[in-house]
């Protein structure tokens, strides 16, 4: 859990366009122990990528906090609410 009393270090990653989750998540291995959290982008530049929620869940297993991005550009309110419920159901909430 991020300590709000100190300066925090974050990094950003973009999931791959691949079904190989371990390759996408292994990019952050060097950050474990260095970064406090990882910001996970959500299909930047209108490009299809692996789910940011799925990537966030796997990164949390490595002991890093995640900052999940959800873009509203290609989703309506119901789709965004479904994404948030999915994230909460797999403990991507802090």
Model-derived features: positions:
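Domain-level signal for soluble alpha/beta catalytic cores
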Residues: 1-94
């Amino acid at each position: 859990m991020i300590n709000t009393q100190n300066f925090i270090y974050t990094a950003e990653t973009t999931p791959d366009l691949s079904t190989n989750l371990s390759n996408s998540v292994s990019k952050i291995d060097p950050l474990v122990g260095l970064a406090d959290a990882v910001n996970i982008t959500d299909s930047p530049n209108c490009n299809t990528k692996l789910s940011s929620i799925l990537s966030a869940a796997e990164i949390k297993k490595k002991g890093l906090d995640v900052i999940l991005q959800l873009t509203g550009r290609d989703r309506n309110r119901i789709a965004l609410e479904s994404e948030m419920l999915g994230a909460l159901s797999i403990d991507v909430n802090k």
